[in-house]
Design a protein with these regions (language model features):
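Pepsin/retropepsin-fold aspartyl endopeptidases
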Residues: 1-147
């Protein structure tokens, strides 16, 4: 309740993230996050449980490497042990700090870029939505917070 009141008084609405523009242009739910003036596009993927960052952009994004490792299953069904890092991103003044699995997504993201024109830097999976209590509404084309 306090969060909603603060956001209303400050003029900030960080409780919803629109993916309408990306859906209209590319038919993919993509949200752009920021680190200062740098933009990073993330695919909202409820089919993935984990968040993934493309290892090829780690030199462009502030992150803290962690000792955490996890198994990552690719689309081909193969399991790989990958490292993780913590990344803090912002959206409309809200801060989102989360652990991302580091994976080489170059081929997949290049394919998406060639077919849709959108440059992706990572994937937000269902654990992110659960942590931040977000629900995807494809009628309104927003991700909104239940809190």
């Amino acid at each position: 309740m306090f969060k909603k009141l603060f956001n209303k008084l400050s003029g900030k609405n960080i409780e919803s993230m629109s993916f309408m523009e990306s859906m209209n242009l590319t038919e993919l739910p993509v949200v752009t996050f920021y680190q200062e003036d740098k933009k990073f596009n993330f695919l909202l993927d409820t089919g993935s449980s984990d968040c993934i960052i493309d290892k090829n952009i780690l030199d462009q994004i502030e992150h803290e490497e962690s000792d955490l490792q996890s198994n990552l299953f690719g689309l081909e069904g193969k399991r790989r042990l990958v490292k993780a890092c913590r990344i803090c991103l912002s959206y409309k003044g809200g801060q989102y700090e989360y652990d991302y699995l580091i994976s080489d997504m170059k081929d997949a993201f290049t394919n998406i870029k060639q077919t849709t024109g959108v440059t992706l830097h990572g994937i937000l999976g269902s654990k992110f939505f659960n942590t931040y209590k977000y629900v995807l509404d494809f009628d309104k084309m927003i991700a909104y917070s239940k809190v």
